[in-house]
A protein has these predicted regions:
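Basic, Lys/Arg- and aromatic-enriched nucleic-acid-binding interface segment
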Residues: 137-143
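A detector for short, charged/polar N-terminal pre-domain segments
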Residues: 7-13
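Catalytic-site neighborhood detector that most strongly recognizes the C-terminal catalytic loop/helix
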Residues: 129
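N-terminal core-binding DNA-recognition domain of tyrosine recombinases/integrases
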Residues: 2-4, 15-31, 37-125, 141
Length: 143
């Protein structure tokens, strides 16, 4: 029995994930689907530009933990993405890897490895403080 090439399995999984799983099972909105597609496309662009991987050579090893961590650094340094954007892109890739591992057990290692990658720290936003003087002016304007 002839087994399907890894690049074909991954390409089919990306297609099913984006056209069936996300819109029908997860019921994501059009904008969310667009974001997920862009996120996956950015990872594939990274593989092509930084690792020399093509659509015919993509394989499970392309989802190694160290490559994903390099990608996160690349997003931050080269693309100038904020920590929030980097975390969103990482969650998209993790979502795909979980889907891929459920479809083909041979990819479960990459799902487990990706799950260990920590999110970037995001700066906490300072709460805006309303001064007593401002509150007095607000109440004074009501009268």
């Amino acid at each position: 029995m002839k087994t399907k090439a890894e690049h074909s399995i991954i390409a089919d999984a990306i297609h099913e994930w984006h056209t069936v799983y996300l819109p029908c099972i997860r019921n994501l909105s059009h904008n969310a689907l667009k974001s997920y597609g862009e996120g996956m496309g950015i990872y594939i662009d990274f593989l092509e530009s930084s690792k020399g991987v093509t659509s015919n050579t993509i394989c499970g090893e392309c989802f190694r933990k160290d490559w994903i961590e390099e990608w996160i650094a690349w997003l931050k340094e080269v693309r100038k993405c904020s920590p929030q954007t980097c975390n969103h892109r990482l969650s998209i890739l993790k979502n795909f890897l979980r889907f891929l591992a459920h479809k083909k057990i041979q990819f479960i290692k990459y799902d487990c490895d990706a799950a260990e990658i920590k999110r970037m720290q995001q700066p906490k936003k300072q709460a805006e403080v309303i001064t007593k003087d401002t509150i007095k002016r607000i109440f004074a304007s009501i009268n």
